[in-house]
Amino acid sequence: MKNIFIINGGQTFAHSGGTFNKTITNWTKDVLESENFEIRISNVNDDFDANQEAENFKWADVVVYHFPVWWFQVPNRLKFYIDEVFTAGHNNGIYKSDGRSRVNPAINYGTGGLMHGKHYFVTTSWNAPETAFTLEGEFFNQHSVDEGVLFGFHRMNAFTGMKSLGSFHFHDMEKQATQERIDNYEIEYKNYLKNALRNVNAEVLN
């Protein structure tokens, strides 16, 4: 495993400048360069060729997504990017079909992906504090990010055949974005990413 494709979904929109996700992208790049991975990076704010982006998915051993959560969904530019690129990847390395046959269409939905053997990793950034997910009576009713807001996102990647390499979530990045917290997050995130990459390398070697 050596090829890593990073997608910076930190869209510039309204009061959001995408600055923090650019920072996370640079942290990821630092880790990958120190481990001698081959890297490609796309930014959803840039114009793109959907066919070339589909080639990036096909080239990658691991796809890394970085994005803020807006209104409990991915930013609109990232959704547009995924729609365009995954359509370009139909019968072209990303997915073939929904996996079902007309003989028994009740079963095997979601098994038509073409990216088996590949992994993905995701980070999200939030205004919401972590306690909004963990404390009884708080907004997300004790549903985690991955089991709640990102459930569909994870299923999307599973549809292509990719396996999750893990996720890391940055909370309270509006009201509590102190330099100390950001510095601590950098250390924690880089260690988490290094361990995740070691785990997938061990899986590949086995």
What are these model-predicted stretches?
Residues 31-37, 112, 118, 156-165:
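A structural motif corresponding to the C-terminal end of an alpha-helix
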Residues 21, 139-206:
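Glycine-rich phosphate/pyrophosphate-binding loop and the adjoining helix
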Residues 2-35, 188:
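N-terminal beta1-alpha1 ligand-phosphate binding loop
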Residues 46-52, 72, 174-177:
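Acidic-and-aromatic substrate-binding clefts and catalytic sites of carbohydrate-active enzymes
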Residues 10-14, 127-136, 172-175:
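A short, flexible beta-alpha/helix-coil linker loop
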Residues 35-48, 168-171:
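A short beta-strand-loop structural module common to alpha/beta enzyme folds
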Residues 1-2, 117:
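A short, charged/proline- and glycine-enriched loop
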Residues 51-153:
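Helix-loop-strand module that forms the ligand-binding subsite of alpha/beta enzymes
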